[in-house]
């Protein structure tokens, strides 16, 4: 922290703070900080950046994609960085879901955190012959498929008893690990409930049903709610008096999960296989151009200085470091006033 003294006859507008001498006037400085201005978000230079989970799935929310809504099936590109762009709670445009009863809205965020995400090509269990069956796999007019016929989510099978429409004690199904590359397996499941008349018609039991899932040391319990739902439609579909509750469990490589259920279960089918890590940051779409850094408050930044002032928030990439006050590097000498000539005596 040594500033060499020199002599200059010019004024010195530059002041730097030093550790040993406090504020010191110097003949020159190099600014080390910048104050960014807000900009659009961009692709992170040198890496793949993910905006929507499925860029080619038109008119689909990320929750639609995560649940396998029939018209929202597509490839999720790999990415080292992901934009959390759906800042408000979103719904799925299929069968009405009771979103607030589980953590299901977190599913798209969970998937964003992985670099590689793919949907399994086969079903994790044979739902038609699961315990308590045989079952007819239910579909809904509120969830049209690509040919506009009745459909349902690819990640779940709506298990409606074929002939044995009676109450049942809790049943257990094991959910095997079927991913093939050592990935995390994200298994989606749930249950359906309706008013008493519909519950008797579909399942032969109008009482609340009990459900439990267990995987990776995490166990979750639910009891279904019977009736009391107004007719509701999602995305222009057929109004429904029933509701579904949807949850998920994460299975580590080689680990089996279990689901204990009664009537109305939505058994897991296609599962997500996910690996690697993708850094996630809140932002907005579309992504325009490229940037050195993605900042939650300022968007895409190109690094022109090593430090910045302004709003402090999460940032990813080659980013400047946040500081409270501007920093300067002295590249001149300590300023000294011009010497005064002695008067002749």
UniProtKB/Swiss-Prot annotation:
Describe the function of this protein: Binds to sialic acid-containing receptors on the cell surface, bringing about the attachment of the virus particle to the cell. Plays a major role in the determination of host range restriction and virulence. Class I viral fusion protein. Responsible for penetration of the virus into the cell cytoplasm by mediating the fusion of the membrane of the endocytosed virus particle with the endosomal membrane. Low pH in endosomes induce an irreversible conformational change in HA2, releasing the fusion hydrophobic peptide. Several trimers are required to form a competent fusion pore.
**Which keywords are on file for this protein?**
Disulfide bond, Fusion of virus membrane with host endosomal membrane, Fusion of virus membrane with host membrane, Glycoprotein, Hemagglutinin, Host cell membrane, Host membrane, Host-virus interaction, Lipoprotein, Membrane, Palmitate, Transmembrane, Viral attachment to host cell, Viral envelope protein, Viral penetration into host cytoplasm, Virion, Virus entry into host cell
| Membrane topology field | Single-pass type I membrane protein
Mention any additional remark.
Major glycoprotein, comprises over 80% of the envelope proteins present in virus particle.
Its localization reads:
Virion membrane; Host apical cell membrane
The identity of this protein, by name, is Hemagglutinin
Q: Which top-level group of life is the source organism from? A: Viruses
Q: What is its main location?
A: virion
* Post-translational modification (record): In natural infection, inactive HA is matured into HA1 and HA2 outside the cell by one or more trypsin-like, arginine-specific endoprotease secreted by the bronchial epithelial cells. One identified protease that may be involved in this process is secreted in lungs by club cells. Palmitoylated.
Provide one Gene Ontology biological process annotation: virion attachment to host cell
Q: Pfam family of this protein, just one? A: Hemagglutinin
Q: Which GO terms describe its molecular function?
A: host cell surface receptor binding
Extract one GO cellular component term from the record. Answer: viral envelope
Q: How does it assemble?
A: Homotrimer of disulfide-linked HA1-HA2.
* InterPro entries referenced in this protein's UniProt entry, alphabetically: Capsid_hemagglutn, Hemagglutn_HA1_a/b_dom_sf, Hemagglutn_influenz_A/B
What glycosylation sites does the entry record? Answer: 25, 59, 145, 164, 231, 302, 331
- What protein family does this chain belong to? Belongs to the influenza viruses hemagglutinin family.
Organism of this sequence: Influenza B virus (strain B/Fukuoka/80/1981)
């Amino acid at each position: 922290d040594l500033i060499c003294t020199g002599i200059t006859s010019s004024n010195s507008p530059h002041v730097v703070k030093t550790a040993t001498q406090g504020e010191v006037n110097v003949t020159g400085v190099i600014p080390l900080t910048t104050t960014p201005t807000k900009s659009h978000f961009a692709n992170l230079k040198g890496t793949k950046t993910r905006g929507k989970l499925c860029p080619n799935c038109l008119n689909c929310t990320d929750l639609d994609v995560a649940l396998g809504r029939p018209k929202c099936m597509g490839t999720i590109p790999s990415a080292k960085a992901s934009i959390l762009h759906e800042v408000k709670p979103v719904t799925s445009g299929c069968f009405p879901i009771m979103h607030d009863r589980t953590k299901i809205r977190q599913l798209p965020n969970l998937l964003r955190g992985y670099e590689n995400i793919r949907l399994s090509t086969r079903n994790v269990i044979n739902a038609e012959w699961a315990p308590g069956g045989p079952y007819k796999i239910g579909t809904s007019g509120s969830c049209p498929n690509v040919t506009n016929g009745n459909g349902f989510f690819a990640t779940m099978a709506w298990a409606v008893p074929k002939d044995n429409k009676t109450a049942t004690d809790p049943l257990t199904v094991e959910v095997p690990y079927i991913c093939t590359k050592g990935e995390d397996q994200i298994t989606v499941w749930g249950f359906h409930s309706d008013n008493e008349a519909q519950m008797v018609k579909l399942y032969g039991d109008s009482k609340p049903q009990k459900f439990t899932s267990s995987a990776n040391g995490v166990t979750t319990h639910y009891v279904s709610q019977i009736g009391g739902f107004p007719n509701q439609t999602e995305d222009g579909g057929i109004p429904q008096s029933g509701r579904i509750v949807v949850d998920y469990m994460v299975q580590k490589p080689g680990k089996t999960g279990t689901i204990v259920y009664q009537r109305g279960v939505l058994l897991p089918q296609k599962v997500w296989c996910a690996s690697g890590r993708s850094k996630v940051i809140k932002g907005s779409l579309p992504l325009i151009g490229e940037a050195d850094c993605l900042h939650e408050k300022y968007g895409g930044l190109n690094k022109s200085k090593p430090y910045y002032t302004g709003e402090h928030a999460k940032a990813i990439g080659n980013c400047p470091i946040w500081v409270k006050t501007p920093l300067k590097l002295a590249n001149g000498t300590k300023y000294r006033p011009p010497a005064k000539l002695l008067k002749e005596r």
